[in-house]
From Swiss-Prot:
Binding site for ATP: 36-43
Source organism phylogeny: Bacteria, Pseudomonadati, Campylobacterota, Epsilonproteobacteria, Campylobacterales
Protein's UniProt keywords contain Ribosomal protein: no
Protein name: UvrABC system protein B
Record's keyword annotation contains Thylakoid: no
The gene coding this protein: uvrB
Keywords (A to Z) from UniProt: ATP-binding, Cytoplasm, DNA damage, DNA excision, DNA repair, Excision nuclease, Nucleotide-binding, SOS response
Domain-level remarks: The beta-hairpin motif is involved in DNA binding.
Organism: Campylobacter jejuni (strain RM1221)
Location in or out of the cell: Cytoplasm
Main subcellular localisation: cytoplasm
Family statement: Belongs to the UvrB family.
Length: 657
């Protein structure tokens, strides 16, 4: 049962939208659209729709910053349910590629984020275990995963009193991808101490599962906090999932290896016939090494390129994705596409770019043709999935409107009574100086300023200029990673600085109630960043503050500017009439500032600055120990054993307190 927790109740305008959407979905309509202005509470409407339908829901967004914001909000709305997070686990990713013109092969290079990997595994585990699941996902949801039925077939179910020999259990754990590690015990590891076996599930954060045996009988089972050295909840039954969604059973693995060998022989015969000896040797060496690894360990580097064989699919079949984990046992589920006017075009372009790069790798003997089936969903496959869709946007594109037909629900009024912002036109000749004067007035009121420019270089130069004039300012563009972006947005809201300069990262979905001034530089430069949709979305960032105002710097009024101003002014009239009817006085949005995603690093800073450990709360000490443990493992991997030993001693000090 999905249970919504909130101190607020839907406004009349929200109630009407919720009622219409729920009725449309229950009637069986596949597509519907929520057209809601910025600040009208679309997220709260989405949460109420989910509660009323009470079915598993996938919420998709086009960027990681919005995913993080949605995850935080829905964790609050559905605190008693399973709210999961599924985005790419790469902090850095360079896919393998080959450039024939220069004969340059670029090896795959990546850096994975352990916490994001854990959250992905937690998402699939929850989908296979529970019905009350809300999952926030990025475009990663469209990329291939393992067969959910194979994944379920690999699970290990523990029940008190069950009989299993230690030898058999350890073999099963290894088959599931878990590694024995009696010294540096970490996620996806297990350790053995006599009749006690500790398992650290790959999708757990701080706790392990401790199994106590009497001979071959499972005598006791409970959660155990390794960092605090404390026993947790007793368990009567526990389901352990594999360490990877690509895990497969022994029978399937043997068949996959057989199929890969057959495809390899066929491809080698082709290269030999075409007298492509370099490609022949390259492919033979590479695939035979991968086969050896698969045979001995069940995994290999780049295992996803053999996904078609491992999942048992045929050439050209739709790959398994997160959607198939939702659809397990043919259950109904809802897909909400947030900021659909941006998300859907992004989904549409994914397949072509991926295919082009991989085709070159196949043609030149770096990969087997089956690697082409390790791909994202084609747009038609995505949009025709066996589920129902709700598109959400302040500016839906023609595609959403066409698909939804008459099932379009408007949400123009804000529960807070806030109006769309006032718009002022300013001469772009003196835009930097004019903005400085306007920004000072806003900052004196303890409010914030957003500035959007057209290039990274201009963002950086403008930041330097305003810093010299004494404004606390930062810039944000695509070179800044997801976690740092989150920190910058948090810093703006908390008052660490007063002005944020960006390009197109300041548009969709960012909820910044402290911002009362939006400055759009060079607003008359026609293009993607100054289209009608982009202008309306950017202006919307000022619609959460009662003093909201937008400055458009220009020399002329373009068609896009005029359309954006007309739409905004028309909405202001409707909103003013609504406020008068219901006697509403506009008030700025009040929104909690989320905790930093860098809490663990901050604790490390506190420790390094000499905060007394004995004065730290136990929960902080546990988090600090966790951070130090990561550093210890990294030092050990880098063969810096003295450093690792020193960190180990510090961890022991923490545990002794």
């Amino acid at each position: 049962m999905l249970e919504l927790t909130s101190e607020f109740k839907p406004s009349p305008d929200q109630q009407e939208a919720i009622k219409g959407i729920v009725k449309s979905i229950k009637k069986g309509n596949k597509y519907q659209t929520l057209l809601g202005v910025t600040g009208s509470g679309k997220t709260f409407t989405m949460a109420n729709v989910i509660k009323e339908l009470n079915i598993p829901t996938l919420i998709m967004s086009h960027n990681k910053s919005l995913c993080a914001q949605l995850y935080s909000e829905f964790k609050g709305f559905f605190s008693k349910n399973h709210v999961e997070y599924f985005i790419s686990y790469y902090d850095y990713y360079q896919p393998e590629a080959y450039i024939p013109r220069t004969d340059v092969f670029i090896e795959k290079d990546s850096s994975t984020n352990e916490d994001l990997e854990r959250l992905r595994l937690s998402a699939t585990a929850s989908l296979l275990s529970y019905e009350d699941v809300v999952c926030i996902a990025s475009v990663s949801a469209n990329y291939g995963l393992g067969n959910p039925n194979e994944y379920i077939g690999m699970v290990l179910i523990f029940e008190l009193g069950m009989q299993i020999s230690q030898k058999e259990l350890l073999k099963k754990l290894v088959d599931m991808g878990y590694k024995r590690n009696d010294n540096f015990f970490d996620r996806a590891d297990f350790r053995v101490q006599g009749d006690i076996i500790d398992i650290y599930p790959a999708y757990y954060e701080d706790e392990v599962v401790r199994l106590e045996f009497f001979g071959d009988e499972l005598d006791a089972m409970y959660h155990y906090n390794v960092l605090e050295n404390k026993k947790g909840k007793d368990l009567k039954r526990f389901i352990l999932y594999p360490t990877s969604q690509f895990s497969v059973g022994e029978t399937r693995l043997k068949q996959a290896i057989k199929d890969i060998k057959a495809e390899l022989n066929e491809r080698l015969a082709y290269f030999e016939h075409e007298n492509k000896l370099v490609e022949y040797q390259r492919l033979k060496q590479r695939v035979e090494f991968d086969l050896e690894m698969l045979t001995s360990t069940g995994m290999c580097k780049g295992v996803e390129n053999y996904a078609r064989h491992l999942t048992g699919l045929k050439e050209g079949d739709t790959p398994y994705t997160l959607f198939d984990y939702f659809a397990i046992k043919n259950r109904k589920f809802l897909v909400i596409v947030d900021e659909s006017h941006v998300s859907l075009p992004q989904f549409r372009g994914m397949f072509a770019g991926d295919r082009s790069r991989k085709q070159t790798l196949v043609d030149y003997g770096f990969r087997l043709p089956s690697a082409l089936d390790n791909r994202p969903l084609m747009f038609d496959e995505f949009i025709h999935k066996n589920c129902q869709f709700l598109f959400v946007s302040a500016t839906p594109a023609p595609l959403e409107l066409e698909l939804s037909k008459e099932n379009i629900f408007h949400q123009i009024m804000r529960p807070t009574g806030l109006l769309d912002p006032l718009i002022e036109l300013k001469d772009s000749d003196n835009q930097v100086e004019i903005l400085f004067d306007e920004a000072k007035k806003v900052i004196q009121r303890n409010e914030r300023v957003l500035v959007t420019v057209l290039t990274k270089k201009l963002a950086e130069e403008l930041t330097r200029y305003y810093l010299e004039l004494g404004i606390k300012v930062k810039y944000m563009h695509s070179d800044i990673d997801a976690i740092e972006r989150n920190e910058i947005i948090r810093g703006l809201r908390s008052g660490a600085f007063d002005m944020l300069i960006g390009i197109n990262l300041l548009r969709e979905g960012l909820d910044l109630p402290e911002v009362s001034l939006i400055a759009i530089m060079d607003a008359d430069k026609e293009g993607f960043l100054r289209s009608t949709t982009s202008l309306i979305q950017t202006m919307g960032r000022a619609a959460r503050n009662v003093n909201g105002k937008v400055l458009l710097f220009c020399k002329k009024i373009t068609k896009s500017m005029q359309e954006a101003m007309d739409t905004t002014n028309e909405r202001r009239k409707l909103q003013m009439a609504y406020n008068k009817k219901y006697n509403i006085t506009p008030t700025s949005v009040k929104r909690h500032i989320e905790e930093s995603l860098k809490n663990e690093e901050d604790l490390g800073e506190i420790y390094r600055k000499g905060k007394k450990l004995e004065k730290m709360p136990a929960s902080e000490r546990a988090k600090l120990a966790k951070e130090l443990r990561k550093q210890m493992l990294e030092a050990a991997k880098a063969l810096e054993f003295e450093k690792a030993a020193a960190i180990r001693d510090e961890i022991n000090k923490l545990r002794d307190l």
